[in-house]
């Protein structure tokens, strides 16, 4: 997941288009707010700590990215960002744009709305499969009649039972690894491969 509100959208537009081209059109951009709860990283570096403001910055940055990936000139005058007649070329391989997955706390409606507007949902700080199922139901309701492909990712520890999450709507499973895990442990998880 990418704390997009911490970055300049024009730079991210170019970086993501390049990554999408290098990967042959396989990039998925995961975005979220991030937070200061991780050792005060935002407040200690002079970055925005207010969730609401970072949410506004994230939404504005996403609008810029979508416009930039179109290959058309971008003119944006927002509360947080300004772009005057810039054309971002080359375009990404994927059309109409690079897929965006939005992270959200399952009980927070505003980020769930954001996730519903894009291509995927990545719930964070899950308490279990029941909370996951409720969040999936909410996102599906928010998407309404939108039948475009949509992904729902879940992050679980190695050895977790994935089946209940798949039944609740998960389309992707990602392995959750603690920050202090050793390289040998990571290699072990990779070599073990997916359960089942």
Identify the residue ranges that each predicted region occupies.
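Active-site-adjacent structural elements that line small-molecule/cofactor binding pockets in enzymes
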Residues: 1-196
